[in-house]
């Protein structure tokens, strides 16, 4: 649950930075039953303790929560902060608020959101309010970037330590809005132990692999490039590769 504390703190920091402080904001936090919902409970507590007007909706009773999320639900109660269990999207009161925190579904989803979750997602999207997604907009598959059904269209997505494929690949990338990559201190050994055949190549890595050129270098001193590519009607890639070599 300590990671949830840190995740929630990073989300609050990003909200404060993007909205030029927390003063005067009226925020709705919508929580599912999983770890993403637990992060949302931390956000709700920290916002309320910062003097923000917060309404926290739970899509499931606390008896359905995971262990860590239950801990943070208890902390809310200990702080005297109320939550509201809702059965349908019609119970959400959104019109008088400034923004929504989406904590319905996280990286554990496979396939599409269930019909009940999808109904809440659709109502949040139609509200016209900016939405801050915790880790991943609800409804997206973190591992594919595919949109299969209803998904939150976020203004800001706050994720932790490493980006997910859905943060980088379209069409899912479009639903993430601005992406804030923050650190919460996942153990390096745990990250290294996660098998992955996907590697993120950055411009810094590519630039670091290029040899340094002499100040008096020119095209005659830097070797030759042969481009073998393209076919009739499909010559765009060949042209781009040749232009890149010339530059």
State what each model feature region is.
Residues 1-60, 66, 156, 167-247:
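Small-residue (G/A/S/T)-rich helix-start motifs and N-terminal tracts that mark the onset
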Residues 13-104, 112-134:
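Nucleotide and nucleotide-moiety/phosphate-recognizing core
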Residues 10, 71, 83, 90, ...:
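A broad, structure-centric signal for solvent-exposed, well-ordered loop/edge residues
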Residues 97-99, 104-196:
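Internal gly/pro-rich beta-alpha loop/helix module
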């Amino acid at each position: 649950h300590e990671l949830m504390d840190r995740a929630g703190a990073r989300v609050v920091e990003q909200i404060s930075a993007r909205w030029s402080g927390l003063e005067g904001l009226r925020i709705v936090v919508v929580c599912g039953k999983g770890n993403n919902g637990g992060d949302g409970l931390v956000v709700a507590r920290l916002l309320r303790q910062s003097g923000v007007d917060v309404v926290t909706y739970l899509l499931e009773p606390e008896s359905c929560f995971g262990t860590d999320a239950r801990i943070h639900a208890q902390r809310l109660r200990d702080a005297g902060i109320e939550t509201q269990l809702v059965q349908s999207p019609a119970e959400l009161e959104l019109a008088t608020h400034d923004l929504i925190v989406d904590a319905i579904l996280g990286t554990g989803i496979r396939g599409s959101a269930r019909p009940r979750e999808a109904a809440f997602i659709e109502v949040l999207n139609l509200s016209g309010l900016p939405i801050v997604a915790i880790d991943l907009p609800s409804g997206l598959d973190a591992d594919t970037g595919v949109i299969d059904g209803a998904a939150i269209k976020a203004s800001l997505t706050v994720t932790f330590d490493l980006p997910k494929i859905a943060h980088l690949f379209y069409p899912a990338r479009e639903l993430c809005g601005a992406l804030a990559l923050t650190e919460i201190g996942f153990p390096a050994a745990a990250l290294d132990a996660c098998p992955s055949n996907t590697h993120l190549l950055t411009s810094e890595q590519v630039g670091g692999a290029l040899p340094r050129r002499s100040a008096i270098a020119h095209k005659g001193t830097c070797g030759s490039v042969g481009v073998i590519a393209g076919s009739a009607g499909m010559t765009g890639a060949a042209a781009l590769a040749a232009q890149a070599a010339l530059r």
